[in-house]
Amino acid sequence: MERRDFLKVTVLTGATAALSGCEKPAQKLVRFLPEERLEPGVATWKPSVCTLCPAGCGLLVRVMEGEAEVVRNGQRGLIRMGLAKKLEGNPQHPVNRGKLCTRGQAGLQITYHPDRVRGPLKRSGTRGSGQFQEIEWDEALGEVAQRLKELRSQDRAGTIRFLTGRSRGQRAELVNEFLTALGSPPAIAFDPLDEPVLRQANLLSFGRAAMPSFDLARAGYVLSFGADFLGTWNSPVAQAAGYGEMRQGHPGSRGKLVQLEQRMSQTGANADEWVPVRPGTEGALALGLAHVILRQKLRPAKEDGAAQLIAGWAQGLPDYSPEDVEKKTGVAAKRIERLAREAAEHAPAVAMVGGAPLAHTNGLFTALAVNALNSLLGSVGSAGGMFFTPQPQLTERERRVAAEDQGSGHRLGAALDGAHALLLHNANPVFAAPAAWGMRERLEKIPFIVSFGSFVDETSALADVILPDHSPLESWLDDVPESGTGQALVSLAAPTMSPLHDTRAMPDVLLEVAHRLGGDVGKALPWQNFEERLRVSLPKVTARTKTKELEDEQRSWNEMLEQGGWWSDELEKLASMSGRPASEESAKKFTAAPLAAAQFAAPQFDGAENDFPFQFQPFVSQAFLDGSLAHLPWMQEMPDVLSTVMWGTWVEINPQTAASLGIVQGDLVEVRSQHGKLQAPALVTPANSPGVIAMPMGQGHDNFGRYASGRGANPMAILAPMQVSQTGSLAWAATRVSVSKVGQARLALFSGGLQERPEELKQR
């Protein structure tokens, strides 16, 4: 061999050896036998349930054969199995009828996310350090059962707490049955997307502590007080379908949508008329409209039900003349009179309220005022109006729980302060609650925390043990959607694919822990798994709705699985779903709010106006909602509907406000309240009222996987712990802030965003 050739071989061999030394040790992967018979290249569609927002839409999941790396019996290997490839809406499901929003489409990424917790973990470092070690399920379950057993033996079962996010159906029932068997208090619900103020108002006005549904398809006129019903509020897919029918389903009549708010939402951008209103004065505006209708006798006067809750109603609301309301709201008196006449003359008309108007200190009054306006318009339980989706009958305990905002600061704080053990499922209060509530500090004092999280978020990072749940597509699911349809329904779904990782369903884990505890706890939860519980319990749930179709003999288990649940064949009569006002005696059982003499009080704000001149208005993100979807890359790269911003947070400032502060688009600004400060790029936009600083929720995670962590800022960090009067709910729109330029920033825009209209085109 020539010397030159020898050197070439030597160099190549050495380089190869060096590179191989940098590689990770090869994992031993076995090949498992296929778990099911699938024909290559042929899709199977399986029904499921979307769990990403409160709407509860039905899904169809396209499953095809593929190869995946999985864990079976503690061993990692490769297998040919059915893999979920695409999500679509279930055409038969009464809520979404085949439609699915972008958030629902992104649900697929939860299953295949690279940052999923793949097996049980035990904390190995200091609390909050994020240091965990892998353990076996037997060890993890044994430790949880032993800790709970010790607390029971010490008569401290009452100090065991279970904190959930949005939860309903049999999962919620099972959790509370588990807690009852332990001798512990009911689960605490913490859902930032819930509307507890509206629930309490609906209980007082209609006897139903529930979210309303709307027959938009037959409406002729819609007044929306801050409710982004086409974007993020309530049941957006169902409401968008109804809105589309209102626009295009009646030749010669398109209906009219009027949106009244401070920051233009997706619904506001679609409205025929957008009316900017001073923050916290929407209730006065609703009664100003009612005053005109009563004074001009445009509709028959209503002096019962919801109307009785409003002071001065019987006298024609003398304190709410258009001129007086103009002073409160900034909406011109002539415009108020015109809107009132239009609403009365273009029946059927309906009003709705949600979002920021209910997040002021006077939010309960605002909701009661809009309910009274609906009563006057004749829209309650009528075609083109509002109603309540049929639900299983509630016990008094369930109704009380529904009426209370358990996730409010003082209730949640009081419950956690005395806890010796905390179980967490689908709740992240360290991120989603105001920093002023001190959730991190409270949780750090709890001796034992168990998380069922599929991801290590800010709250799960404080856990002692993580018992990862299956993804929704790998789980048995049931749901009872609360709004969006006039049909009684119960959704049901079997797993659409086998688990990829060494995870277990949260209900199955609770059942296993109950069996390990034995005694009364084991007897109270006799089922071997959640599937068995569903088979036994669903017929009882459906029978409680008292409709003839819901007898369990008429719908077999297999039929429910095939179509994705059970629902009545026909719409119920809307009049039967209108509810009735709560009596004074029954209302006092569920709320401290008065039944009579509700009257406008100016909203209160935290922070002196001289030091903090702007009202701070966080809004629910189109992509991330409250932040629970920020870990999904499809959501990060999706442009915001109005601003077109991607991969970040922004602060919306009106052009007039920005000019007065010397701020231009892209400047890095500091937003400061009495409770903290944050920095984000400025977005100068006419979609925001002067004097209002708006910012999307959802970004600013410290701990939520590679796509969310360290990205943007969290507006909850600077909110004041203000409460909605007489409810205890968080008044998240009651914080004042200051804004100042601190530097330059990069703002990723897909396009130019909204532009201000020429002055001559603006509607007065």
Task: Say what each PLM segment does.
Residues 70-72, 84-85, 299-302, 336-337, ...:
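Acidic/polar loop patches that form or flank catalytic/metal-binding clefts of enzymes
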Residues 127-134, 291, 295-331, 496-582, ...:
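N-terminal leader/propeptide and maturation segments of large enzyme subunits in energy/redox metabolism
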